[in-house]
């Protein structure tokens, strides 16, 4: 299961109970789980049945670094809006949550967060810690895809 992020993912995916149930089911089956950018937040809220901890507890997970968070207003326009589907006027004061901070809490004392503020296309950040493939943001999207191919080729 692969989830891609972006600024809308905190609203649509991260807090979505259906997404959490899918992640929990795939995790219980030992399936590979991938998330890019803010979609990594969905891992935080998916829980292990045996102890109620996040499925990423004790893991090394890549997260969008807090240095990249911003507090300027972030609109969520609907592209190609029509009179029948006009969209919303939703605006949040920056990102909905600080991803690095919530991932740090979820991985706990035995895990670690990989958040590299200097990441770019030439120095992307993607990591695998079974069963999780995670990557930082759009600059790491190619590395994320490459890491998924590498991991799935070994299964």
Regions found by a protein language model. Give the residues of each.
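Active-site-adjacent pocket-lining segments in enzyme domains
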Residues: 2-34, 39-155
């Amino acid at each position: 299961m692969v989830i891609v992020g972006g600024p809308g993912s905190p609203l649509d995916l991260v807090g979505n109970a259906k997404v959490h149930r899918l992640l929990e089911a795939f995790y219980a089956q030992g399936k590979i789980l991938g998330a890019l950018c803010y979609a990594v937040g969905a891992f935080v809220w998916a829980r292990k049945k045996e102890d109620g901890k996040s499925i990423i507890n004790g893991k090394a997970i890549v997260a969008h670094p807090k240095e990249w968070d911003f507090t300027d207003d972030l609109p969520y326009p609907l592209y190609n809006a029509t009179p029948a589907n006009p969209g919303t006027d939703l605006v949040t004061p920056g990102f909905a949550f600080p991803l690095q901070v919530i991932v740090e809490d979820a991985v706990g004392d035995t895990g670690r967060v990989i958040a590299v503020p200097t990441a770019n296309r030439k120095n992307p950040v993607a990591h695998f810690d079974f069963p999780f493939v995670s990557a930082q943001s759009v600059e790491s999207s190619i590395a994320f895809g490459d890491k998924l191919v590498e991991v799935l080729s070994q299964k």
